[in-house]
């Protein structure tokens, strides 16, 4: 994976565990450090990303030379200044899921911590891909939007199947989708990044557009889950 070096940011791990500034038992602190190191050994990060031309339709975005149609007012607004986008798919592989299930049987606390570490890891891989796309855009006097995933805003999760086919993701990095539109391996992410002209107005990710807005524990505590 080139220069990809995951940190497994401790503060992010704590946030996913619901940490709100309370005192943490030393045993838990040690377990977190143990899991941060263990997750690096058991994950196999893989990612693909491809540049695609897009066409603005009346109520959707067509991704050229694919069967992927992105429906929704939010994604239309997100990509309104874009003629190209990047489709990306990231996964940590199956081993992390197997290890987490094992710990669920013998040490539930460790299973929860390892899961939080895995969530942190997949987001760090996504950040890495986004940085690559950003750097390439700058070289061409372009810029990018923030990454936008199916399930965010009014972009339905049922685009996942077409999304994976557009990238040939099952063949390239083993990603599949269930009949309920869940990605497998479970610690996987798909996202869209718009390519925009340098100096274009950049949109800010809004919690109110998230499908989990009403139930989000981060928001209730005055925090956000993204940049």
Kindly label every feature range from the protein language model.
Residues 1-114:
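Active-site helix-to-loop segments that bind/position phosphate- or nucleotide-bearing substrates
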Residues 41-52, 127, 139-143, 216:
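Intrinsically disordered or highly flexible coil/loop and linker segments, enriched in small
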Residues 140-217:
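Short terminal or interdomain "cap/linker" segment that borders an active site or interface and mediates
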Residues 27-30, 34, 120, 124, ...:
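Conserved active-site and cofactor/substrate-binding residues in soluble primary-metabolism enzymes
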Residues 223-227:
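Short cysteine/histidine-rich metal-coordination sites, predominantly Zn2+-binding motifs
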Residues 107-166:
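Internal, well-folded beta-alpha domain core
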Residues 37-44, 134, 138, 168, ...:
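Generic secondary-structure signature for well-ordered alpha-helical cores
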């Amino acid at each position: 994976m080139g220069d990809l070096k995951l940190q497994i940011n401790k503060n992010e791990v704590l946030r996913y565990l619901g940490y709100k500034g309370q005192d943490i038992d030393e045993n838990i602190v040690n377990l977190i450090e143990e899991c941060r190191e263990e997750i690096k050994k058991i994950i196999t990060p893989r990612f693909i990303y491809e540049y695609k031309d897009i066409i603005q339709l009346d109520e959707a975005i067509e991704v050229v030379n694919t069967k992927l149609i992105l429906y929704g007012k939010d994604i239309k607004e997100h990509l309104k200044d874009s003629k190209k986008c990047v489709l990306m798919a990231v996964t940590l592989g199956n081993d992390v899921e197997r290890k987490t299930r094992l710990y669920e049987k013998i040490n539930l606390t460790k299973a929860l911590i390892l899961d939080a570490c895995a969530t942190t890891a997949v987001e760090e891989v996504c950040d890495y891909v986004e940085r690559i796309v950003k750097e390439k855009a700058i070289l061409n006097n372009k810029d990018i939007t923030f990454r936008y995933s199916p399930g965010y805003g009014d972009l339905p999760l049922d685009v996942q199947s077409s999304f994976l086919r557009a990238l040939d993701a099952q063949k390239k990095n083993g990603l599949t989708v269930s009949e309920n539109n869940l990605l497998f391996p479970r610690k996987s992410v798909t996202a869209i990044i718009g390519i925009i002209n340098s100096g274009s107005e950049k949109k800010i990710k809004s919690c109110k557009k998230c499908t989990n807005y009403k139930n989000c524990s981060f928001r209730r505590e005055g925090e956000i889950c993204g940049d």
